[in-house]
Amino acid sequence: MPRRRLRVTGRPPASSRIPRGVRTVPWPDYGEIMSITSRRGWRLLGPAFVAAIAYVDPGNVAANLTAGAQFGYLLVWVLVLANLMAVLVQHLSARLGVVTGASLTELLGRRLRPVPRRLFWAQAELIAAATDLAEVIGGAIALHLLFGLPLIWGGLIVGVASTLLLGIQSLRGQRPFQHVVMGLLLIITIGFTAGLFAAPPDWSATAEGLIPRFEGADSVLLGASMLGATVMPHAIYLHSRLSVDHAGADAGASEPTPGESAARRRALLRASRWDVVFALVIAGSVNIAMLLLAAGNLQGVPGTDSIEGAHAAVAAALGPGIGVVFAVGLLVSGLASTAVGCFAGADIMAGLLHLRIPLLARRVITLVPALAILAAGWDPTRALVLSQVALSLGIPFALIPLVRCTADRTLMGEHVNPRWMTILAWAATTAIIALNAALVWLTAVGLA
């Protein structure tokens, strides 16, 4: 049976599946969308900021603090490279959603045969579960640091709070949800950069850290973990869906003329580029700040191989106020990222299995594995780092279809990737797969 080809139209198809409980925004007014470079253009920003929450989740905290505490400034280059890759990847994801009017998972659901489609869904759901695990555990650790709550109770509170956050998306629509998430991203940024301003890093050592190199198997493992925490599979799936919703996928929007449709699409693509750059520059800066904070203040300090130990060391070195701000940043990171991850999981199921479960019901279901880990007494920081390794292994399954779809002229029309962009995307995908292969080999032979 030949693969189905999708024709590009001026309006997202009416069949575009949106997870139940998700409200879309109206198709933007023509005058508004053409004013992206004016004062009103900021209103078109937002989807990338929601996706960027995935880049500053508790898994990043565990991976980046561990890397800085163990290897100092050695792996700065990994974060810089990973964030450059993230800008390219999220741009492609947004581009796909704007041009086709469908998310990546929906396109794969149409193109894949039943068995490959179910297998793809299974691995995507496992990756989403690993993501949720990291986010709930991170929030629980933050509540323990702030109030001394047992981890299991902290996990329950994070689950309830993230459910309320999802309620904003379900009841008020995407734009209010985006505004809330952008505010949370600001709090996260303050929480994880305050310590850096209090104790600036060694900038000459930071510059040396930009030279690509590893030192032993453990640094490769951490490099893969940092890459998995930075280039997030569920963020790739989610951003294409958010772009569809933001462009106005609801059936009640007015039908544009062909000329307006082309102009709107070009303006939306221009807006999405700025959206991605702004959001990921912020997220990337936060990631690098985490590593520099650990490299400058935690290297060689006993007990910093856990988030709790790192927090104690930061508070001891920079004062209890910085410690509280750090813990608040971690808590908000967990709350925001678990809600965003649940939304991404709903799109995965809707696009690949054509099943739609209410977001609130899905939140309850996905909370169970994280609570089980907390109740079992496993080392939470180790669970966070391993979850990021799992995310790294899932990246190729999201990247390869994304690059293939955005390089398909039949699907993308005049907005197909330029040749240089496709080459860069394939180079990034190849590098990630090679690093993953090294990680699997090191784990198999017991070196990692």
Per-segment meaning from a language model:
Residues I157-V158, Q169-L196, F214, A390-L391, ...:
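Membrane-interface loop-to-helix entry segments
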